[in-house]
Amino acid sequence: MKHHLLLALVVLAGIVPFSSRAVYMDEHIFLLMARSAHTNFLFPQDTPALFFGQTRPSFVGHTHPPVGEYYLALLYSIFGEFREVPFRLLFSVFAIAAVFGFYALAKRFTANPLWLSLLFAVSPAFFVYSATLMMDVPMLACLLAGFALYFGHVQGRRGFLPLSSMCFILAVGIGYTALVPLGCFFAGLLAARRPLKELLSVVAAPVALTLYLVAMTIHFGAFPPALTLGYLVTQGSVFRNVLALLSFTGAIGVFPWLVSGKRLPITTSVLAVAILTLFTSWPSMVYRLWFIVLASSGLVVLITFAGAARKLIVSGKNTGEAFLILWVPATLLFFVLIGDMISARYILLALPALYLVIFRDASERRLIYITVPTAVLSLTLAYADFISVNVNRDWVQQTVVPLQQEGFRIWSGAESGLRFYLEQKGIQTLSATDVSPKPGDLIVRHKLYHYGLADSVGALSIILKTFTLTSAFPVRTYNQAAGAGFHDSNMGLVPFIFSRAAFDEVEVAEMCPLEAAVWSPEGPIFMQREAEREFPMKIPSNTKIEYELDGDGAAAVMTSGIRLIKGPAPRIVWRNFRIVPKQFALQ
């Protein structure tokens, strides 16, 4: 009990400081599914989808079954609305359960289960994702709990087998990828010729998932996994996935190079990775060298795992470890071949088995030696990620809210966290064909997740100001400019890097307030031939008029709108006429 309390406190110590973390990545999609579950519990995916400007009738191709979203729906029922801190704190039950499940397995398979479990709790991948609402930790928690309960059954605990089966069902109900380690577990049971009831307890999970997918296929008229796989296999590059897999394995399992073998594997690993770097381009030599450092460390980890697995096989001992030996290569190979990218959360799924095999006989002293610097690294990465995801929420509060108070109508052309916080303020997200914005409306877009808008919208919009979102903290975890891809290797082939590159650039554009304006290469223009022309509109407060003018004329702001007055010339041209918030000019 003392050990469990210690483990729970360590997990909470990694979550509580970051519980105010802003919504980011796919969290806004999970929250949308959770809200939809209140009106369509069985099929929460049956809600209109808008993703990167593309509209679809539903989220039938959503990459996760809805069990995890049901828990979020429960939190919505309790609080009535989304709140970062209580949602993340109550979501921590999954992180605690995952560590408890790992500890139970470590007690069975390793010499120092407590310290190994502490190492797992502070590993970078687990530590960072524990404070998120992503579904990887809940899926892993149910999976590890199921394995732990199964071995409890093997030791004679009554009633543990059906509980184990229920955990497996929940795991695949949260994420399809739980089927990979579960398949390895089933293969291990078959090889050991375990009783039929044990085999059935595992088979129950894919059977339950299949039944649900059949129901979804009947309801939506499409088979969800086929849609998901059809997208993934057309997006990824196997070679880039291999490169990213090596660097991520070497950097987010434990502190780099603390898992090392003999000098020959180390030398061989560095040379092998250096050769691999010849087959792709690199933004700089420094970046390439950083990749070699991390990727060669990852290759050593995999070589060490292979050696430990071979030693385990040669020993002839079999206390149920067979599935651990299969789990790591099967999971990593799956993501390399199927994934559209590599992410730290993908490596997380293989991490328990990797630890249980590599550190099977590790001494307490060695584990302490590894745990301390790993915890420091994890804290650094968690803080860096915390800063990067919070900039969107902070920017919306500091910039968008005042614009709304001044009377501007605002639209969103954003995704992920920025989209979520704009929508929280009642701002509608535009599709690529939506022509709803009217003259004088503002549109918020950003560089990180940029997508095209309707031609008429893009042609008549004028960028008022571009904001650079950044921080002085010198570590980046998810940053295309820096090449850091902790959450997505398409951003970079290393999970983190030392850099102060800007997180994102957010632009605020305005639909030209002059309704009769037309497109030109230099921006929207209005040709005036009449002596006066009025444009009725409500002018937001605390603003000023800016424009470029070819000819002699003047613009008068009235309570009812704008009056354009032409001079003696037969025609004048107003170019980039805009209503600018005064705070933009001051900034």
Regions found by a protein language model. Give the residues of each.
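Membrane-lumen/periplasm interface segments of specific transmembrane helices
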Residues: G183-Y287, L377-N390, D394
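Short helix- or helix-capping micro-motifs
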Residues: L116-P124, A148, F168, V172
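Transmembrane-helix motifs of polytopic, lipid-linked glycan transferases
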Residues: P86-F109, A145, L149
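Membrane-interface transmembrane helices that cradle and orient dolichyl/undecaprenyl
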Residues: K107-T110, G146-L163, A171, R193, ...
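Membrane-embedded, lumen/periplasm-facing catalytic core of multi-pass transferases
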Residues: I368-L442, K447, G483-F526, M537
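Short acidic/glycine- and proline-prone juxtamembrane loop motifs at membrane-interface regions
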Residues: Y24, V128-P138, S343
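Extracytosolic helix-loop segments that constitute the early lumenal/periplasmic catalytic or substrate-binding loops
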Residues: A13, I29-V60, V67-Y70, L74
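Transmembrane-helix signature of polytopic, membrane-embedded enzymes
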Residues: K2-H4, V85, F102-S123, L140-A141, ...
